[in-house]
Regions:
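Basic Arg/Gly/Lys-rich low-complexity intrinsically disordered segments
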Residues: 1-52, 263-265, 273, 280-281, ...
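Conserved G1/Walker A P-loop phosphate-binding module
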Residues: 19-114, 118, 122
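Conserved glycine(s) of the Walker
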Residues: 58, 199, 290
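Conserved, well-folded catalytic cores of nucleic-acid-processing
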Residues: 69, 88, 92, 104, ...
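Active-site glycine-centered loops adjacent to acidic/histidine catalytic or metal-binding residues
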Residues: 100, 162, 193
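Conserved C-terminal guanine-recognition region of P-loop GTPase G domains, centered on the G4
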Residues: 118-187
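Canonical P-loop GTPase G-domain recognition
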Residues: 156, 165-223
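P-loop NTP-binding site
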Residues: 228-320
Length: 320
């Protein structure tokens, strides 16, 4: 049946009698049947889970937090997760294979957005569960547009109320849950904070309920199906987006030109491609300061990914 983080609709009024503060929010959720209780499943489960939502609700941060490794580019700029990226979370009782999709866009302003919207639909076509992520502050018009897409194509949908750490009065979440269940028959509604790591185990528990009994698809040590080269390119692009902010259009792309890896280290040469000559000084910065910082931050993350010393060169080039 339909559940609000573990409770049926007729039981939810009982929770409204509790007066909550930030400190006893966890206690409220424990009373609702979530807590830290873990059920040991006899049969191993495995399946695909899509993550959808409008831009900037924390989809990539959520996957990174659950998987425990950085698998999806995160940025304050929307539309930076351009391709389907799988993140694999493996436990003793289940393996969840996450399909991270771009945020559903309300207007097709470019071929890029059209491609991204097609990617959303493709991702929903062959998954066992869907995480629909919205901001715990409440529903927005773009959330409603995503919901229309789910009405047509989704199977088992869990509503994730993210960023609960930013909601001072946690009691406000209860009417939001009731409102949400009126909009769509969600399999469960789970409030979380991906940034702070709150309620993630409970979310994983709800996902596992929707997965079929199956042996794991991937080796336990794997956390993404993307190659190190792909993740390195995404890492460089992420640093560029973070450091350049609103200065750079979305045409920026990264290509790995050379990749020489040994047991002791890796030498990587990458190109940051921009659409216009006038974009080059924006990326390079005064006396090369921005490009050096992009390279420095990316090199540190790539070295951590590979577990070895990394020499990284990044060049800025213009598409001709």
């Amino acid at each position: 049946g339909r559940t609000y983080v573990g409770k049926s609709e007729d039981e939810i009024p009982l929770l409204k009698e509790k007066v909550m503060s930030d400190n006893d929010f966890e206690a409220m959720l424990a009373a609702a049947g979530l807590g830290n209780k873990k059920e040991i499943q006899e049969d191993y489960r495995c399946g695909y889970t899509a993550v959808v939502g409008r831009p900037n609700v924390g989809k990539s941060t959520l996957i990174n937090a659950i998987v425990g490794e950085k698998v999806s580019i995160t940025s304050k700029k929307p539309q930076t997760t351009r391709d389907r990226v799988l993140g694999v979370a493996t436990d003793d009782d289940a393996q969840i294979v996450f399909v991270d999709t771009p945020g559903f866009q309300s207007k097709h302003t470019s071929q890029l957005l059209k491609h991204m919207n097609r990617t959303v639909r493709t991702a929903l076509a062959d998954v066992e569960a869907v995480l629909f992520v919205i901001d715990a502050a409440g529903w927005k018009s773009d959330d409603e547009l995503v919901l229309k897409l789910l009405d047509r194509e989704a199977k088992n949908v869990i509503l994730v109320l993210n960023k609960i750490d930013l909601v001072k009065d946690k009691e406000r979440l209860l009417p939001l849950m009731a409102e949400s269940m009126q909009k769509f028959p969600f399999a469960a509604i789970v409030p979380v904070s991906a940034e702070k790591g709150k309620m993630l185990d409970d979310l994983k528990g709800e996902i596992k309920k929707l997965l079929p009994v199956s042996p794991p698809f991937f080796d336990a040590d794997l956390y993404t199906d993307k190659s190190p080269r792909f993740i390195a390119a995404e890492t460089i692009r992420e640093k560029a987006f973070r450091l350049l902010g609103d200065e750079l259009p979305y045409g920026l792309a990264v290509m790995i030109e050379r990749w020489n890896e040994t047991d002791n280290g890796a030498e990587i040469v990458a190109s940051l491609w921009v659409n216009r000559e006038s974009h080059k000084p924006i990326v390079i910065g005064e006396k090369g300061a921005k490009l050096r910082e992009i390279s420095r931050l990316a090199r540190a993350d790539i070295a951590e990914l590979l577990g070895k010393r990394v020499h990284l060169e990044v060049w800025v080039r213009v598409r001709r």
